[in-house]
Regions:
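Short Gly/Pro-enriched turn/cap motifs at secondary-structure boundaries
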Residues: 17-18, 123-125, 145-147
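Active-site HxH/HxHxD metal-binding segment of metal-dependent hydrolases
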Residues: 43-133, 221-235
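Short coil/loop residues immediately preceding or within conserved phosphate-binding loops
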Residues: 23, 123-125, 131, 138-141
Length: 247
């Protein structure tokens, strides 16, 4: 199982957990507690990996409700913090349909139990809101509402390391607004707010390496230039029953 994950040191106490799932998780290790941000698809034994790195009490956070970020929630016994607006949609985004689709074309680990995986829940969720602060001992995790990619997306800022975790709010490829997303105007407001924070690095879930402030500025510009509201609709090639638009 150790070969399934690739753990990268980003900064003192900050570790990025990559895998073939292409949905990174992040471990923040203070002197008193550790925090895990997102649990990926949950195809590997993430709890065992975390325990091999730290024995500190663990707090778990989700950036948003999509199954490639909460797929491993059910592997943990701890309660998990998530934006309150996203909690009602977890049953949909964590459905067997989406889990099966996420398994396709993946390098599954040895001894992978498909039946257990498809029947796994998404854990006991606790709503978190902007202004919530968690003292890990020498490192502080600050919560910011970040609606856009989903209505309940959250960003997590570590001021001592000038690092911000954004989930899927910032991507290097294209902005995707699917089921449960907030409006384009709301997303632009989120970017404006987060850009005021004094961060140097952005840890985005689908980027192997840290992103820079310019990447967030670029995403904001794309959202400003897009014309989704009057764009030409077409059938979503990824999710049945949804309509996408050419902007």
């Amino acid at each position: 199982m150790s070969n399934y994950y690739d753990v990268v040191d980003i900064a003192p106490g900050i570790k990025r957990i990559n895998s073939s799932e292409n949905a990174a998780c992040d471990l923040i290790i203070g002197t008193k507690k550790a925090a895990l941000i997102d649990t990926g698809l949950g195809l590997g034994d993430l709890p065992a990996l975390v325990k091999s790195i730290t024995s500190l009490p663990l707090i778990i956070f989700n950036t948003h409700c999509h199954c490639d970020h909460i797929g491993g929630n059910g592997q943990f016994t701890q309660s998990i913090y998530m934006g309150k607006e996203d909690i009602p949609t977890c049953s949909y985004s964590n459905s067997v349909y989406f889990r099966k689709s996420m398994m396709e074309h993946r390098d599954l680990p040895e001894n992978f139990d498909e039946e257990e995986y498809l029947g796994r829940g998404f854990g006991h969720l606790i709503p978190t809101n902007e202004g919530d602060t968690f003292d890990l001992g020498g490192l502080t995790l600050m919560v910011y509402d970040a609606p856009g990619h989903s209505s309940g997306s959250r960003a997590y800022f570590i001021p001592e390391r000038k690092i911000i975790y954004v989930g899927d709010s910032v991507l290097r490829t294209v902005l995707v607004f699917g089921y449960g997303a907030a409006s384009r105007k709301t997303y632009i407001h989120t970017m404006d707010k987060l850009l005021k924070l004094p961060f140097d690095k952005i840890l985005a879930s689908h980027s192997y390496n840290p992103l820079q402030r310019e990447d967030m500025e670029r995403c904001k510009r794309v959202a400003e230039l897009a014309d989704y509201e009057t764009g030409e609709p077409f059938e979503n090639p990824i999710r049945d029953g949804e309509t996408a638009r050419i902007c």
